[in-house]
Structure formats: C-alpha cells, structure tokens
C-alpha cells in the first residue's frame, strides 16, 4: 500500500512528510540550542527539557485520551513547539511557569483547533505572550549569561530594554550605546541579556540557511520582514537619530531573527501565496517597529506575529492561488 504523506498548507510538491519537515526544523534549531546551553549553563537545560517534555506529554494525553485519536507526537511538531517556546523564555524562568506556557501553547492554541495544520496562531508565540501577560515578573527578569561552568549571573537588561529605559531618562541612543558598551559584534555572535533565543543571531541564521538549503521554507516572508524593518527604521533614524535606533540594531536585537526565520514562516499560520506572504511579512515588520518605538514594551515581534496570524484567512482569500489550467 502506498503511504500518503500529508503536510499543512502550503503543500510541497515532493514526497516530504510532516515528520521530515519538523525533523529538519529541530536540526536547524540545534546551533541556537547549543549556544544557549554553553552561555546560560545548566539552568537552560532545565528550561529546554521541561518545555519539550511538557509539550510532548500534553499533546499525547490530549490526543489519546480526550480526542481518542492515534498519537501524533512522532511527527516532531510538539518537539518544535517546545524548543521554540524555550527559546522565547528567559533561562531563569521557573519550571512550573514553563509547564503552564506549554499547556497553553499545546492544549489551548494547538489542540483546541484540531492539531497541527488547523491552529490559527503560532503555539510557541501564543504561549510566550500568555506568560508575558500572566507572569510579567518572571518574563522580564533578565540575567547576563554565566556560562556552563560559570559563577552566579548578574542581573542585566536586553539591548532593546536598555535603549527604551535610556530614552525615558532623556538620554540619546548614542549615549545609551556608549555607556552600556553595546556592540554589533555582541548582537551578532552572543553574550547579551534577554530571552534564550536572543543569545546569538549568527546561530539562528545558520539554522535559517539550513532550512533554505533543505527547501523546508521559502525566504520571501523573512526577507519582507527584514526589508520592512530596515526601510522603516532607516526613515525614523535619519529623521531623529538621537531618538530612534538604526536598521542594523533593529535587525539583530530582540526576537527579530528567531521570529522572522522560524516562527513567521510556520506553514500552518502563514499565507499560502507568495503575495500574501509578502504582505504578511510587511505587516509583521511594521508592527514590530511601531511597538519598539512607541509601545510600552521594548519588543514587539511576538505581538506582531500573533496579529498577522489573525489576518491569514483574509490574506488567503485576497491573494488566493490560481487553480491549475485557469487564468
């Protein structure tokens, strides 16, 4: 009997299974996971372990005992959600907060809508936002990396948080950058406070290149996000460089790389057409910058992705793909 291979839309015209796709995403995330463990130490292992194990267990229990269906945990999608959720959390997050985030991501956001391919919102992003609203103290407490065998870490702030706080204290962006010792090399390679997924843009970009090489994702959503962020931030920066950060800063900090490369490109929660995907990416980039520049939160990537997730049905209707053989 031939084996039917199914994946969430948009469908890939090749014999590629959901399991294979998700396995590639796990492999692509490994550089960031390894760097996070090296820089954050054993506490990060706890966050990663609890997040992945909780997502897998919760999906198994719901599928087998509530939905009365065969288990879907072997397709690796729950593992991907667990890894992405962990990378969106501070490494100091208590294990029970991580578990609640996993319960919301899988139990509410994913399985309530019927499982993989049926969910409207990205589960990992929704889990992070839920925790940010419910447990702001844990989600906004940052410590600088102590290392795998390092001493106790010291409290710190994210680059976006430092700039936001400095501007509120009537400092200029250049003053904040100078006094804090922030450098673009740090942003690209590692050693900054923030969520685990903010530790190294280079490690995340390596995973992104792997996904492109494996043809797991297409680059147009990510590139439209980057292009929008670069263009809009350039306009603001040229108009008032003392008040607004430059394009490179915005491209390398916060959840920009993780969100644009691994979560905005999620098949189930992004548009099916290229035109729809480009509009989707433009919206994410613009909303992210507006939150960063004018919102109360330093970072806006998570909110931007969730907002644009909600527009996907409309974008699919507006930019529907032409049926084969029709003009």
Per-region residue spans from a language model:
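Cytosolic-side transmembrane-helix boundaries in multi-pass membrane proteins
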Residues: 1-23, 293-327
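N-terminal signal-anchor module of multipass membrane proteins
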Residues: 1-56, 60-63
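Alpha-helical transmembrane segments in multi-pass membrane proteins
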Residues: 24-32, 47-59, 77-82, 86, ...
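Structural signature of hydrophobic alpha-helical transmembrane segments
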Residues: 42-54, 92-101, 187, 191-201, ...
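C-terminal ends of transmembrane helices
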Residues: 57-69, 106-117, 206-215, 261-270
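Membrane-interface helix-loop-helix junctions at boundaries between adjacent transmembrane segments
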Residues: 84-89, 93-153
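Loop-to-transmembrane alpha-helix initiation sites
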Residues: 120-124, 247-254, 277, 296-308
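Long hydrophobic alpha-helical segments that form multi-pass transmembrane helix bundles
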Residues: 123-205
